[in-house]
Amino acid sequence: YQEALGATLIERTFRERIVLVGVTLGGHTDEDTEEGLDELSLLVDTAGADEAARITQRRDTPDNAFYIGKGKVEELKEVCLAIDADTVVFDNELTPGQQYNLERVLGRTALDRTAVILDIFAQNAHTQEGKAQVELAMLRYRLPRLRRGAKAGLSQQGGGIGTRGPGETRLETDRRRIM
């Protein structure tokens, strides 16, 4: 549990500056999006961070790569740089691929509402059962978000003399630890 709590998603040594992102999809109103962002702002505050800015976009459907459009991603990047934001938090559920793509382009952590809620639970779990349940939920959330490391330092692909092949990659090791 301590390892999971230590790896909570929002840094607490200082109050992070967060940019909130909301997308108004077809069938919803701008007011719905603003209400969702107001609630998300309270969640972020509870998690120990400060809302620094908000960005919204209207879309018929989410972008497969980023959830928001490429132009809005560039605008988000500029806002993050201008206000020195640490993290962006989406009110909408991000796929692991969207989260990865956003983090790669923005150069900072991208989270969704679920991650913030899990972070709050991790901070406030006190009983053994509660801690175990939070850890399990966090591991289930993180499992599909594991990525193969691009750096050679993350690979453990050396098979030794007399072994039957290459060793585990970091991704395989992480996946095995979670499962």
Language-model features: where?
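N-terminal accessory targeting/assembly segments
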Residues: 1-113, 117
